[in-house]
Structure formats: structure tokens, C-alpha cells
């Protein structure tokens, strides 16, 4: 083994991972049952600093590749989705089943995610995401 070349591992960047999850959320809309995508975006944005330009570029590329409109007008971000008892129950079940380390209400997670992704769609000139403050600077 020692005389073999090191293996090459292909992996998504965090920015591409977020872009892929965000596109799936927007694409699936109201009938989205991929609560892990919401949770992952929430957790990653609570933990890591992101470059606005790098993350926005990943989002643009992903949405263009999938031919998905870049808009926050998805039913997945609507009050109707958030207040739907079925989605609320499924969110709680997801957290329990996955033994989520960060327990967060669906409402709090969605508010945080919206603050994180909205400027990416609006093209607002920002520099970096501050995970401690929960805002773009």
C-alpha cells in the first residue's frame, strides 16, 4: 500500500452542498419532505463563515444547471408551509429520529435560513457570513 499513489477523493465544497440543498428545497416547494436539507443548511450556517461571492456563485451555478428559478417565492418558504401541522410534526419526528445534536424549532430554523439565503437571491453586495451573529457583513 505504501508504494501506491494516494487516493483521490472527490467531494463537494460546503458552498456547493448548500447550493444543492437549497435548490432541492426550492424545487420541491410545499410538498418538500427533505427536512434534512433544511436542517443541514441551518447547522452549516450556524457553524461556518462563508464568503458571499463563493456561496452566491455556487448557488447561481447550481440553479442554472438545474434550470430552477432563483427566487425566495417558493412555497417551501411560505407561512403556509411553516404553519402546516403535518410539516411541524414531520420536522419534530426528523429531529427525534436523527438524534439531532442541535434541537431547533422549525420556525426558528426557517427564520435563520431565510436570513442566510435571501441576500444570495437578491444579489445584495455582502462580504461574508458571520455565524455568531447570524448575518451577512
Give the ranges of each region predicted by the language model:
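Structured mid-to-C-terminal alpha-helical surface segments
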Residues: 1-137
